[in-house]
Amino acid sequence: ITQGNFDLKELDIYAVGKKGKDALQRAGCKISLDCSDICEEPTYADAAALGRRVLTSFAQGEVGEIWLAYTSFINTVVHEPRLIRLLPVSKEDVDEKVEREGSAGLKLQMNFEAEEESILEMLIPKYMISMIYGGLLEAAASENGARMQAMDSATGNAEEMLEDLTLLYNRARQGAI
């Protein structure tokens, strides 16, 4: 967020996670909502509540765009920061995603008879909530991976220190004999 083309003073940030919130505050961002309590064990209900709040702000014109920033889980060692625009959806964003992920093998399976507007009114909230929930889960997985890596490193360091201390103890004991 701090490296993007954003006016940090104009952002309404709904922060999930203490470290991210603290870093954004240090960078001069205004935190509109602190949701740090949901980051440990995120639930779909938490994502739905946050999604509804964000959508209400968007629908009332309080915000012009909605972006989701989160840590993407690649594996236990690698985590990548991601920033994606959720709303408004642009044709360029869709084309880029289709190009990146491919559309081979996709075929039309049904025709919609409902009005486009009513379909979008139903789908956009579900899309928003699922993207927020996915971001929460990926961030939680990334944090757990980082914790596992840190514990593994600490265990290795402790074992190495124990070997060194055992060697020193044995040398001192041999010297005393």
Feature roles, as predicted:
Residues 1-177:
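C-terminal beta-strand-loop-alpha-helix "lid" module of Rossmann-like NAD(P)-dependent dehydrogenases
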